[in-house]
């Protein structure tokens, strides 16, 4: 399982001209599900996202001290199978991504676990399988790449 985690001042997802999800300050996370991913991979990614220390402490004297949970910020998750793109020349293949008919339930289970592990009202998401316009205002920018197979 892969995740691209971006610290944001705000982020939103629009589908067919309608804003379906938005957050204020927090994290916008692109989530890719691999064909061999398991529940343990999802739990690892969730734990890392919730506990990464990406913000300064309260008095601003120490960088990289506080997590999204400690800051009580929101998280916007967006499913992104293209994180598993394999390139051969200029053509990409997605054979390492989990099949859509399996990955949808896997993704929904991942979201449920994130809600149980944090605060349900702080977890937002896009629309699985939809063409989405994702807008964000980076904070920093701070961007972290995670891969559950590279622990």
Curated annotation (Swiss-Prot):
Domain writeup: A Gly-cisPro motif from one monomer fits into the active site of the other monomer to allow specific chiral rejection of L-amino acids.
Protein name: D-aminoacyl-tRNA deacylase
Domain of life where this protein originates: Eukaryota
Primary role: An aminoacyl-tRNA editing enzyme that deacylates mischarged D-aminoacyl-tRNAs. Also deacylates mischarged glycyl-tRNA(Ala), protecting cells against glycine mischarging by AlaRS. Acts via tRNA-based rather than protein-based catalysis; rejects L-amino acids rather than detecting D-amino acids in the active site. By recycling D-aminoacyl-tRNA to D-amino acids and free tRNA molecules, this enzyme counteracts the toxicity associated with the formation of D-aminoacyl-tRNA entities in vivo and helps enforce protein L-homochirality.
Quaternary structure and partners: Homodimer.
InterPro entries in alphabetical order: Daa-tRNA_deacyls_DTD, DTD-like_sf
Gene3D superfamilies assigned to the protein according to its UniProt record, in alphabetical order: D-tyrosyl-tRNA(Tyr) deacylase (3.50.80.10)
Any Pfam family hit: Tyr_Deacylase
Main location: cytoplasm
NCBIfam families for the chain: D-aminoacyl-tRNA deacylase
Enzyme class: hydrolase
Species this chain originates from: Dictyostelium discoideum
GO molecular function, one term: tRNA binding
The enzyme's E.C. designation: 3.1.1.96
Catalytic reactions of this protein: glycyl-tRNA(Ala) + H2O = tRNA(Ala) + glycine + H(+); a D-aminoacyl-tRNA + H2O = a tRNA + a D-alpha-amino acid + H(+)
Motif (Gly-cisPro motif, important for rejection of L-amino acids): 140-141
Localization per record: Cytoplasm
Gene Ontology CC terms: cytoplasm
Nucleotide-binding as UniProt keyword: no
Keywords: Cytoplasm, Hydrolase, RNA-binding, tRNA-binding
